[in-house]
C-alpha cells in the first residue's frame, strides 16, 4: 500500500488541513509470493474507498499508529482516507469549523478529483470509532447519496445523552466545549440526533446506507449502541449489530476493524 499525507485548503473549514491516505499498490510479499500485480495499475482503475474517522482527543494518523488496518485493507485492494476533525463530534460547529460539511461532501469530492477513487456510491464507505462512529453514521445519513455503507465501532451514538452528561467522559472535555458545538447544548437539532435523522430520511423515502455497529460488552457506550440498534431496526433500516467481549480501547478496534472490512465485502 502507498502511504500519502495530503495537505490542502478546505473551503468548508476555511483553513489548511491534513488527510492521511492509503492507496493499493504492490507490497514486498507480493514479490516474494509471486503474485501478479499488473492489474493494480490498469488504465482507468478507480478504487473503492473507506473513510476512517478517529475518536475524541485524537487525529487522522491514529488508525495507522495503533492498528494494522493498512495491512488488512491490502487484502481487499481498498483505499483508506483518514481525516482529522479535532474534538468536533463531526458536526458543523456553532463556534468552530463545519466538519460535517467537510466530511460528508467536500472531502469525498476533493479526494475523487485528486486521487483514483471511484465516484460510485456503491464503492464509497465510511466508518469510525467512538466519536468517529457517531460521525460515520451522521455523515452517511446526511449524504446517503455518497455513502452506501457506514460502520461504527464503540460508537458514541447518543449525542443528546452525551451532551446532557450521561456518559462518564463528558466532564473531561475542554472548557466551553459544549458551547462551541451547539448554540443550545440541551436542545440539539434533529439533524444531529441519529434516530431522528434516520426517521426523517426513512419518512421521505430517501435511499439509506446499510449500517453496521460493533461494541464491546464492557464498553460504557454499550447501552447507547443497544438503543440505537433497536431504534434503527424499528425504522426498517438495514442494520447489523455485533457484540464481543472487550472495552473501549485499541485492542478491540484493531481486532474488529477486520469485521468491518469483511462486512463491506459481504463476507460477514
Task: Identify the function of each model-found stretch.
Residues 1-268:
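Non-catalytic cap/lid and distal C-terminal segments of serine-dependent acyl enzymes
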Amino acid at each position: 500500500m502507498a502511504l500519502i499525507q495530503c495537505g490542502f485548503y478546505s473551503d468548508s473549514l476555511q483553513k489548511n488541513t491534513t488527510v492521511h491516505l492509503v492507496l493499493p499498490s504492490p507490497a514486498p510479499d507480493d514479490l516474494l509470493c509471486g503474485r501478479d500485480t499488473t492489474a493494480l495499475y490498469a488504465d482507468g482503475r478507480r478504487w473503492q474507498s473507506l473513510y476512517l474517522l478517529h475518536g475524541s482527543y485524537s487525529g487522522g494518523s491514529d488508525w495507522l499508529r495503533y492498528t494494522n488496518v493498512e495491512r488488512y485493507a491490502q487484502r481487499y485492494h481498498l483505499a483508506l482516507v483518514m481525516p482529522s476533525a479535532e474534538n468536533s463530534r463531526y458536526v458543523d460547529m456553532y463556534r468552530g469549523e463545519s466538519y460535517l460539511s467537510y466530511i460528508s461532501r467536500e472531502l469525498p469530492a476533493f479526494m475523487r478529483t485528486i486521487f483514483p477513487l471511484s465516484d460510485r456510491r456503491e464503492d464509497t464507505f465510511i466508518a469510525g470509532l467512538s466519536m468517529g462512529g457517531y460521525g460515520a453514521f451522521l455523515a452517511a445519513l446526511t449524504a446517503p447519496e455518497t455513502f452506501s455503507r457506514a460502520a461504527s465501532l464503540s460508537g458514541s451514538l447518543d449525542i443528546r445523552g452525551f451532551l446532557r452528561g450521561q456518559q462518564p467522559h463528558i466532564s473531561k472535555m475542554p472548557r466551553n466545549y459544549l458551547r462551541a458545538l451547539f448554540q443550545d447544548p440541551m436542545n440539539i437539532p434533529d439533524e444531529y440526533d441519529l434516530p431522528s435523522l434516520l426517521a426523517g430520511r426513512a419518512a421521505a423515502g430517501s435511499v439509506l446506507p446499510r449500517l453496521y455497529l460493533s461494541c464491546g460488552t464492557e464498553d460504557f457506550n454499550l447501552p447507547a449502541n443497544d438503543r440505537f440498534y433497536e431504534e434503527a431496526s424499528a425504522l426498517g433500516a438495514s442494520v447489523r449489530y455485533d457484540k464481543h467481549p472487550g472495552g473501549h480501547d485499541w485492542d478491540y478496534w484493531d481486532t474488529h476493524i477486520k469485521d468491518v472490512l469483511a462486512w463491506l465485502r459481504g463476507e460477514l
